[in-house]
Amino acid sequence: MKKIFIIIIFFISLNNFGQDEKVIKDLFDSGFTESKAYSWLDYLSNEIGGRLSGSYQAQLAVEWSKKELDKLNFDKVWLQPVMVPRWVRGPKEFALIETEPGITFNVPVAALGGSVATPSVGIKSNVVEVKSIDELKLLGKNKIDGKIVFFNRPMDPKFVTTFTAYGTAVDQRALGALEASKYGAIGVIVRSMTLRNDDFPHTGGLTYGALPISKRIPAAAISTNGADKLSGLLKIKPDLKFLLRQQCKQLPDAQSYNVIAEKKG
C-alpha cells in the first residue's frame, strides 16, 4: 500500500511539473511576442539614461518602474529599502601614450566602476602587457613593480553566445586591479569587453576585495582600437610610457529601493 501511495504522489508531481512547465513557457512566449519589454527598455535606456547606483537617474528608474508595474495586474507592488554604493565618475578621464618625449597619442579611456582616482596630475609609467591574471603572476613583482599593467585579452569571437565570450574575458576587468596591486603595479588598463573595434571604452565594475584603501590602484577601460594601438606600439617601443588621469570618487552609501511585484498563485 505504501508503494502504491508513493507511485501516485510521483505521478501527481510529474503532472504538476508538466503544467508548471507549460505555464512558464507561455509566460516566456508572451513576453517575447506581446509585451512592452522593448519599449520599456528604450525608455529606461534613452529617456532615463545611465543609472549608476545611488544616482539621481537610478532613483528616477525606481519611481518609473513602480509606476509601470502599478498599471499591470499584480496583487501587490512595493518598494524595499536598500543601501547601495555611491560612486561618481567625475570629469572626463584622460590618457595618452608617449613613445618618446614630445611624441604622444591620445587614447579613449573610462574609469572602471568603483575604481579609485589617480593623483590630480595623473600617473605615468612604463607598461607591461599581459593576456591573463596567470601571466601576471608568472611575471611577478620584479617585472611589475612601479609599472602600469595592460590587460589585453580580447573576447573570443568564436563563441556563438556573446555572453560566453564576455564571461571568459571579464575576469581581467573584475580582478585585474586587485591582482596587479599585489605585485606593485601603480595602475591598470583593461581592454574593453566588446567584440567591436571602435573608439568607445566600455566600462564595468571591479572589486578590490578586502584590499585596504591605501593599497588600491586606479583602473580604467581602454577602447578596443586604443588597446590595439597600445599593443602595436609596445612591440615597436617597449619602453614607451602611458599617462592616465581620472578623478572618480567613492561617496557614502545612498538610499535606494528594490522594486518588487507579486502575483500570488
Which residues make up each language-model segment?
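Extracytoplasmic/secreted proteins, especially bacterial periplasmic and envelope-associated proteins
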Residues: 26, 36-39, 43, 60, ...
